[in-house]
Amino acid sequence: MGGCEVREFLLQFGFFLPLLTAWTGDCSHVSNQVVLLDTTTVMGELGWKTYPLNGWDAITEMDEHNRPIHTYQVCNVMEPNQNNWLRTNWISRDAAQKIYVEMKFTLRDCNSIPWVLGTCKETFNLYYIESDESHGTKFKPSQYIKIDTIAADESFTQMDLGDRILKLNTEIREVGPIERKGFYLAFQDIGACIALVSVRVFYKKCPFTVRNLAMFPDTIPRVDSSSLVEVRGSCVKSAEERDTPKLYCGADGDWLVPLGRCICSTGYEEIEGSCHACRPGFYKAFAGNTKCSKCPPHSSTYVEATSVCHCEKGYFRAEKDPPSMACTRPPSAPRNVAFNINETALILEWSPPSDTGGRKDLTYSVICKKCGLDTTQCEDCGGGLRFIPRHTGLINNSVVVLDFVSHVNYTFEIEAMNGVSELSISPKPFTAITVTTDHDAPSLIGMMRKDWASQNSLALSWQAPAFSNGAILDYEIKYYEKEHEQLTYSSTRSKAPSVIVTGLKPATTYIFHIRVRTATGYSGYSQKFEFETGDETSDMAAEQGQILVIATAAVGGFTLLVILTLFFLITGRCQWYIKAKMKSEEKRRTHLQNGHLRFPGIKTYIDPDTYEDPSLAVHEFAKEIDPSRIRIERVIGAGEFGEVCSGRLKTPGKREIPVAIKTLKGGHMDRQRRDFLREASIMGQFDHPNIIRLEGVVTKRSFPAIGVEAFCPSFLRAGFLNGIQAPHPVTAGGSLPPRIPAGRPVMIVVEYMENGSLDSFLRKHDGHFTVIQLVGMLRGIASGMKYLSDMGYVHRDLAARNILVNSNLVCKVSDFGLSRVLEDDPEAAYTTTGGKIPIRWTAPEAIAYRKFSSASDAWSYGIVMWEVMSYGERPYWEMSNQDVILSIEEGYRLPAPMGCPPSLHQLMLHCWQKERNHRPKFTDIVSFLDKLIRNPSALHTLVEDILVMPESPGDVPEYPLFVTVGDWLDSIKMGQYKSNFMAAGFTTFDLISRMSIDDIRRIGVILIGHQRRIVSSIQTLRLHMMHIQEKGFHV
């Protein structure tokens, strides 16, 4: 077959060329390919070199769009030993390291050509050579490197010519690495009948892209296909790095493994991969990929890209208010001020202002002025009055005024303030009220003097008041140690203007106040009088004087014996009278401590909230620890108030013990400090093996910087360790480094619990314990709660997360941040006024009415039992809090966890009685669990013990009698599921009583409300069946 025949073939199939051209044109626009040569786009002659001249022929035809189609063909199949070469022009490699050659060609089947079996071939060879510049017409085939032998996937025959069928082959070969500036390609024909329709040379790149708001430039992949090129991106305009953005360029030009990202800066939001400025009236306060927000009420902005909206005139934003909070204004004045006065106290009450300014942090201050008859002439009251609880920063809308003076006009100005009052230049609004104290009350006493003093006693007298307005009934004397002012005081009474006070400390200064009581009431307390008791020396001198008198009297002779005898009898009688009087006064004397009566022999538990200064409660109930005895080792977590670290505590004369140190974070508010110290004050009153033990507190002294910077960096950030330059390491001998000047941290030091919180511990060791081991854990928790209940405390946040486990698997109750002390009434409950409640663990009455009691703790204990037996599963699983509340109201209770004995689940159900008086006491729970531990075989037989527990509701309520399962479903309005139950084989009540929530889902009950109703009814059915079986009946 000659060249003319091939040319004729191509011309016959010319109508395919436009289609071919269009297809190759699409490929040339692949985004990750850079084309170096494409013969289909060359408008002029190619000018490729052929060797020999009569080998390859160039054929150029025009397609229907008048674009040239360059083709090279050769078909010297009749002659043997063909060696025809076709070489391209010099091709610049650009930035490529590896190139790809795409060839489109047709090839004639040798079997379709007669008489050429020995000379016809069906392959050709592809070669290349690298060069830094063009060789011109020089061509040395021996210098070329072979790339591959190219064979056709399809070849055409004479029949294809007749049927006008074009069989076009496409082959791609890769070449590399290319190190010089350019290269040549060469095609060797060795006796084939072939037409080279097009040649395209390209290399691959990872194209420019934007990912996660980061731009990545064009990148050339490495020659080695197994390695990736790491590319760091740059953030788009108005964006900033959150994590370093990276992509990896693969060998095929694909971007892989995106890491990091950029986020839109403040004032900008992400829209379709770029950051756009917030429109006027909108803002974005923090960098991130969230949308701009509309300005909150009473604020606006009129420019773009705003990070915070500005408050309108008269409105303000406090320093700690988030930008999303509406601007607020100071409140109006309080309303409806009223007073109530008696002999000793003046009570001021008022209503909240009509306009709170849009804030909840409302406080009040009371300013006192003394006015004469002319109310325009007033002066400050000074420090004579006492305000309970205080006169500034009041949260409640009332205050008690003490120590006021009779016959005085007092004007009280009550100011209302909130968090932005200090930002306003306008005067604080107030409401004033004038109170004239009672003219009938007696005036104050005159001067007070010390008649004599001993080591333990003081004899005092004073001037009666100038105006008593009636007979003086008695005097009330209040006294306390000067160094312990307002911490502890005692009082006594005397009918005369004198008193002998006994039971005092030697060489101690006491403060005395006296007020008068008449039929018309009390006077105010007098000014302070200071007197000091004697020391041992003065008492010895007095005793020596008495001895001298006795000796002189004895020498006087027998004649004075009768007189002396009479003298001693009279003296003895007087002393007996004085002692009797002192004893009577001692009985009447009442010792007061922070407003609580102290009775001998009865331990009283004091609510820390009754202390105006929380540090006073801490120092009374908790031991102050010298911080040099503490060594901090590492951070183990974060609590509500700050970080929690582990460390060691050195006790004098004992070995070091591991401890946990709870810290108060920097920038805390007074309320946070008070709550933080309150927890320590509560823990310090507990002493039980199942209650977390308080080792002590650090509130006074400076703290050594040992390991703090390395392990508790927030100390340094919070400014607790001002002046510390660098922490000193502990020496090899274990000695502590020199002291470093430091600030005043606040810490609570408790025993260290190696296994952490119970819920995490159980999840980590799922299935590792026997049932008796789990019951032992539950018994420890119940024992700790019994101790708290006996003391009159309500925990309010009992959950597995608040139970800590030590290395011996002893469980201890912790986290007393929500605890409240109860009054003497054993059925008393604590009512909260706000705050978050852990819905899944809290009793219904506590959720609905905020009424907490030991019975609500029993409900929470039932949830803890369920957590323990399920190895730390989340109660009520993925149900929302609202669904939990509704489900409990409808009677739903948690089913028994897998493998949970019936007796334990029945105890849970008993704890979850809706009527709180029917729930078991912790005493009964401990007793029941003790039975199980002593007799493990009773785990499946002690259900009856639960049903007869004290405070049990008694017999199970009457349950309707159903003949069929269908009747039962109809009674709970679930009759539509009869066929589901029948088809699944649940045809008897015995089978139904064993159904779980998974069984109910499996038979096709999809709606959650229907699932809850059926499960609740099954639980009631199960309890009823168990009860009648215990009574000897059968279902």
From Swiss-Prot:
Pfam families: EphA2_TM, Ephrin_lbd, Ephrin_rec_like, fn3, PK_Tyr_Ser-Thr, SAM_1. Residues 571-1035 are cytoplasmic. It comes from the Eukaryota. It is an enzyme of class 2 (transferase). The modification Phosphotyrosine is found at Y605, Y611, Y830, Y977. Its EC number is 2.7.10.1. Residues 330-440, 441-536 form the Fibronectin type-III domain. Glycans are attached at N342, N396, N409. The chain crosses the membrane at residues 550-570. Residues 630-943 form the Protein kinase domain. This is Ephrin type-A receptor 6. It comes from Mus musculus (Mouse). The gene is Epha6.
